[in-house]
């Protein structure tokens, strides 16, 4: 109910504040503006001053959405959804920063906890598959990749059983918007994604499911693109960082 939701929101805000991040609870109209931005930025925020509270939901919803095989159009703006099909085996801190900062995109990360018993069972199966792949592979590169994956899974299995580690199913979608009337807008975004060793899927024929999964909601319809990531690796995503020095001639104080 509404009271439980309010208490949960206050508790979450309190936990975030402990990390040194300031929070603000949005009002109805501020929330409506935020949700409308999740579909497109081609609107005037000042419109909301004339909107009554009982018409906010209708104002947030797109007027017209047309889907094609590998793209869609929302209120006249061309867009396309990508899903991350594969992740790099080794990542650095803030590994999500470059992906979340691609211009003219919306990035949504869905996270769902996995039961510990099911997680251990899944990892056992994956280790067995990687051992078989390593033995049967005729290419050195594939065998090396399988060995690296197996070592990673062994380390994860150990941490799940002996430490306070958990497994989470993650779906990462990137929506590219053609705000600049660029015919190559999808290629530019795809290239930026691949720079970080992520493997994007064009979701050919799955743009409706991609649109649903990229909405600000707990719904994720791209089950085939869920990937299990351990909690400590996921915590290192840090999407809200700057990837460059802000001051001209600034002095670097250190790194971790």
Which residues fall in each region the model found?
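Extended, folded cores of ATP/NTP-driven motor/assembly subunits in large transport
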Residues: 1-238
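Glycine-rich phosphate-binding loop of nucleotide-binding enzymes
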Residues: 248-256
């Amino acid at each position: 109910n509404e009271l439980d939701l309010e208490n949960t929101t206050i508790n979450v805000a309190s936990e975030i504040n402990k990390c040194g991040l300031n929070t603000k609870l949005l009002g109805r109209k501020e929330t409506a503006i935020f949700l409308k931005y999740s579909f497109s930025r081609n609107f005037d925020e000042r419109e909301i001053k004339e909107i009554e509270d009982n018409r906010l939901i209708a104002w947030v919803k797109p007027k017209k959405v047309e889907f094609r095989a590998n793209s869609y159009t929302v209120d006249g703006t061309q867009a396309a959804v990508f899903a991350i099909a594969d992740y790099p085996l080794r990542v650095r801190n803030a590994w999500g920063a470059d992906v979340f900062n691609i211009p003219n995109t919306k990035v949504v990360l869905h996270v769902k906890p996995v039961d510990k018993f099911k997680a251990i069972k899944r990892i056992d199966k994956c280790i067995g598959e990687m051992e078989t792949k390593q033995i049967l592979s005729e290419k050195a590169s594939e065998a090396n990749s399988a060995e690296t994956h197996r070592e990673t899974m062994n380390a994860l299995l150990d941490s799940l059983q002996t430490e306070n580690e958990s497994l989470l199913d993650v779906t990462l979608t990137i929506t590219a918007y053609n705000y600049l009337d660029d015919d190559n807008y999808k290629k530019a975004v795809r290239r930026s994604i691949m720079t970080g060793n992520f493997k994007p899927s064009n979701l050919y024929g799955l743009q409706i499911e991609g649109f649903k999964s990229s909405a600000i909601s707990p719904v994720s319809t791209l089950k085939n693109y869920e990937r299990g990531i351990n909690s400590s690796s996921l915590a290192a995503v840090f999407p809200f960082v700057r990837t460059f020095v802000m001051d001209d001639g600034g002095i670097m104080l250190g790194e971790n």
